[in-house]
Curated annotation (Swiss-Prot):
It is an enzyme of class 2 (transferase). Disulfide bonds: none annotated. Catalyzes the reversible interconversion of serine and glycine with a modified folate serving as the one-carbon carrier. Also exhibits a pteridine-independent aldolase activity toward beta-hydroxyamino acids, producing glycine and aldehydes, via a retro-aldol mechanism. InterPro entries: PyrdxlP-dep_Trfase, PyrdxlP-dep_Trfase_major, PyrdxlP-dep_Trfase_small, Ser_HO-MeTrfase, Ser_HO-MeTrfase-like, Ser_HO-MeTrfase_PLP_BS, SHMT-like_dom. It is found in: Cytoplasm. This is Serine hydroxymethyltransferase. The gene is glyA. NCBIfam families: PRK00011.1. It comes from Thermoplasma acidophilum (strain ATCC 25905 / DSM 1728 / JCM 9062 / NBRC 15155 / AMRC-C165). Homodimer.
Length: 426
């Protein structure tokens, strides 16, 4: 049965590709890679190992790997305007692990966004911070503006004196108030760590905010959301040499050995493409997000942060508690071929994670395959018909498939490729 089992897995992978190729992906944490990035992902690099830094390896056979990593660092330095870059983390959470091991130890206090306020699970007491045995305290959150309250948070920092102030959210609609809180950071002498996983591509495109120039010592991130590369991680710095050395030691030998060389190379290619196409891509993402949010709001959905224009990023949050709840809405839309996720909102208890009040929507992948303002309006109409008018999911799914058929080619990159085709080798 072994071959049949292998064929079964292959068939399921092909069906998975077909599902996304025929559907509209609005998950805020996903994207599709460019042809060149995907090409190096299946190169011989995927089979090889490298430990340590370029030209100081523990393995032979790394001559070309070193050249690739050198160039990747150069591209990241140019893109983010810093000499401190590390492309080795194998995911955003892996990068976060290295950061917390470098910046804080057991018993230290770290200020973080709350989970229901959009914070990432790695920054929760049951995530990496808890595993490091640090103490956490959450910033006061302004539900009207859907961001940290800078005045109250500054007072908290001065009173509690955390060793590290962590910013960054998985529902990241507006810039973190780094500049507004700079005086508090300086008064207590804390390190400022910015988790830019969701908005890294917007930052690369010169949009949203510039954390390294606004006071962040360290920026961590994954490289497959608004930054449209492989599932990998990166760390950027604007800090003292001692702290940067601690970060690099935490990466290796701290939280990884080999750093997935194919993904590192794909990251470098994506950085090169971002230097050429990133500004336009970031502009189009934000423009599309605003249009979709406005249309959903006009159609009767409770899209949050209406007074602030709904969003300044790729993401919007929608309170669907009166539409059946996050679980029902996400599952219903999946039946229609529209893929997004349920999400906690600031007033939700963490215990409601399986059926929260909200949904989270991201437009970076739809934008990546060429969708624009008119398609955003059409998507809003399809969502409205499914959730508010309760139309037949199969009917809507057929219309989704028809719409998506014209938007499969990856844009904002070198070359042309169907982003959803399954690559058969045998």
């Amino acid at each position: 049965m072994s071959y049949e089992d292998a064929e079964y897995i292959r068939e399921m992978a092909m069906k998975h590709s077909e599902m996304f190729g025929e559907g509209i992906a609005l998950i805020a944490s996903e994207n599709v890679m460019s042809p060149l990035a995907k090409e190096v992902m299946i190169s011989d690099l995927e089979s090889r190992y490298a430990e340590g830094l370029p030209h100081h390896r523990y393995y032979q056979g790394n001559y070309y790997v070193d050249l690739i990593e050198d160039r990747t660092n150069e591209l990241l330095s140019k893109l983010f305007r810093t000499s401190q870059t590390d492309p080795r983390p194998i995911s955003g959470t892996n990068a976060n692990s290295a950061a917390i091991y470098a910046l804080a130890g057991p018993g230290d206090l770290v200020a973080t966004p709350s989970l229901s306020g959009g914070g990432h699970i790695s920054a929760a007491e049951f995530g990496i911070l808890g595993m490091r045995s640090v103490r956490t305290i959450n910033y006061p959150y302004d539900m009207d503006t859907m961001t940290i309250d800078p005045d109250q948070a500054s007072k908290m920092i001065i009173k509690e004196k955390p060793k590290v102030c962590l910013f960054g959210q998985s529902v990241f609609m507006f810039p973190a108030p780094l500049k507004e809180m700079a005086e508090a950071f300086h008064e207590v002498g804390c390190k400022v760590w910015y988790d830019g996983a969701h908005v890294l591509g917007l930052i690369a495109g010169g949009r949203f905010q510039d954390p390294l120039r606004e006071g962040a010592d360290i920026v961590t991130g994954s490289t497959h959301k608004t930054f449209p590369g492989p599932q990998h991680g990166v760390i950027l710095g604007n800090t003292d040499d001692e702290t940067w050395k601690a970060v690099r030691r935490a990466v290796f030998p701290g939280v990884l050995s080999n750093h997935h060389l194919n993904a590192m190379a794909a990251l470098g290619i994506t950085a090169a493409e971002e230097l050429e196409f990133g500004k336009r891509y970031a502009d189009d993402i934000i423009s599309n997000a605003k249009v979709l949010a406005e249309e959903l709001y006009a159609n009767g959905f409770n899209v949050l942060a209406e007074k602030r224009g709904f969003t300044e990023s790729h993401t919007m949050a929608v309170d669907v508690s009166k539409n059946g709840g996050g679980k029902y809405v996400a599952e219903t839309l999946e039946k229609c071929g529209i893929i997004l996720n349920k999400n906690l909102l600031p007033w939700d208890d963490n215990k409601k994670s399986q059926n929260p009040s909200g949904i989270r929507i991201g437009v970076q992948e739809a934008t990546r395959v060429g969708m624009g303002k008119s398609e955003m309006k059409e998507i809003a109409s399809l969502i409205t018909r499914a959730i508010i008018r309760h139309e037949d999911p199969e009917k809507i799914k057929a219309e989704v498939k028809q719409l998506k058929s014209g938007f499969r080619e990856v844009k904002y990159c070198y070359g042309k490729m169907d982003g959803y085709s399954y690559i058969k080798l045998i």
